[in-house]
Amino acid sequence: MSNDLPTKKDLVKWDQEDALNWTRGEYEIPNSKACGGEADGKAIYFCGNSLGLLNKKARQHIMEELDVWSTSSVTGHFNHPYQRPWKHVDEPLTPHLAKLVGAREEEVAHTSTLTSNMHNLFTSFYQPTEKRWKIVIEKGSFPSDWYAVHSHPRLHDKVLRPEQIDNAIIALVPREGEDTLRTEDILKVLDDNKDSIAIVWLPLVQYYTGQLFDISSISPKVHEIGALLGLDMAHGIGNVECKLNEWNVDFAVWCTYKYLNAGPAAIGGFYIRSGLEDGGRRLAGWWGNDARTRFHMSPNFQPTPGAKGYQHSCTPVFSSIPLLATLQLIEAVGFSNMVEKARRLTGTLEALLKASRYYVHPADPKGKIGFKIITPAAPYRGTQLSLVILPEEEHVMPKVFDRMLRKGLVGDERKPSVIRLSPVVLYNTFEEVGRAVEIVEEALEEEEEERKR
């Protein structure tokens, strides 16, 4: 190990000195054995990029809502002993979410799920013409985004010819031998297709590689060529600084069960830039009607101004209210403080991993047991590091992942060969980072020994 690397004592000291160390006590840390470990005790949970942990106050809030349902039933929509009437359950969330994504409150809605929200907004804002109909998306995008984007040109077969539908998608791919997209290559694709692009759809943070896209550089080019910019912020919100207004993003969607800890398959949300016109193309529902007249049951749809006018159904209480606890905690801590700690936490993980004898440099011979990191260096990432387990062609990742689980480290596997590790500032520690690296090494050492037999 290099002398510049932290020792175990250093990591313990950093945790003790950490001004945010108290937030870990706000969460319920999973049991290692329940997660597949061989021993009892708390797991090292580095999987908040997939599903965040349960906030203790979220448990309390859920129990309170169950009590209201039990004692008040339907009247809980209007009279609520905890001042959270179900009729307005989204209202206390909106200011927090707007601040977190860098938007105005009227530009944010809290509803449905990510892919459904994506379809909702594409229905309104993908308006292809004979000359401008293409959608730019990265080829390695999350499958649900890929499926959703491909489905929309087919809905416009009265406007688009079959050959246009077949060629409606421009797929961004990294350069040969590289794992992530270069900003200059994205800009070149936009320039080369400037007259035919209708929408550019990107993630803020790429789910597989952990790459944070340079939206501030991409957005001006998108608008210069006359296209709209949409973002999938599933891995961005609560993880990295989001500045939707400053970046001039047109629309965006997100989920809340990762870094916002709202629970499995919890509610989603979306953003629509003020002034963005839908040309009368809107999927309407009663919860998008003006709240002042919503319960008049009028046959005439009067949309709420802004993003909330694109809502359809009433807000699900039990997948929304757990979100409040983490949003209030973020407000108390200060998101900029979280980002600063995240840089240190993930930076420490990166440094220790790169010091490992199992870290494989590009110049190392092929066939070596180990890992490479495909996530870009700071600042072009969030908390996640994506490790490709080598050799890729031998598909050793599942075995290594299973060994890690048995030793108490909960990461996230993504086929064919990636293990994602994401230390989350609200409940992970520097000491856990050190132990996580040891477990990765132990798992690879066992694989190495098995190959020698």
From Swiss-Prot:
Family: Belongs to the kynureninase family.
N6-(pyridoxal phosphate)lysine: residues carrying this PTM: K258
Disulfide cysteine pairs (residue numbers): none
Annotated EC: 3.7.1.3
Pfam families listed in its UniProt record: Aminotran_5, KYNU_C
A GO molecular-function annotation: kynureninase activity
Protein purpose: Catalyzes the cleavage of L-kynurenine (L-Kyn) and L-3-hydroxykynurenine (L-3OHKyn) into anthranilic acid (AA) and 3-hydroxyanthranilic acid (3-OHAA), respectively.
Biological or metabolic pathway of the protein: Amino-acid degradation; L-kynurenine degradation; L-alanine and anthranilate from L-kynurenine: step 1/1; Cofactor biosynthesis; NAD(+) biosynthesis; quinolinate from L-kynurenine: step 2/3
Localization annotation: Cytoplasm
Subunit structure: Homodimer.
Gene3D superfamilies the UniProt entry points to: Aspartate Aminotransferase, domain 1, Type I PLP-dependent aspartate aminotransferase-like (Major domain)
GO biological-process terms attached to the record: 'de novo' NAD biosynthetic process from L-tryptophan; anthranilate metabolic process; L-kynurenine catabolic process; L-tryptophan catabolic process to kynurenine; quinolinate biosynthetic process
Positions that bind pyridoxal 5'-phosphate: L114, T115, F142, P143, S144, D145, D232, H235, Y257, W286
Required co-factors: pyridoxal 5'-phosphate
Reactions performed catalytically: L-kynurenine + H2O = anthranilate + L-alanine + H(+); 3-hydroxy-L-kynurenine + H2O = 3-hydroxyanthranilate + L-alanine + H(+)
Major localisation: cytoplasm
Any single GO CC term annotated in Swiss-Prot or TrEMBL for this entry: cytoplasm
The organism's place on the tree of life at top rank: Eukaryota
Keyword tags: Cytoplasm, Hydrolase, Pyridine nucleotide biosynthesis, Pyridoxal phosphate
The protein's name: Kynureninase
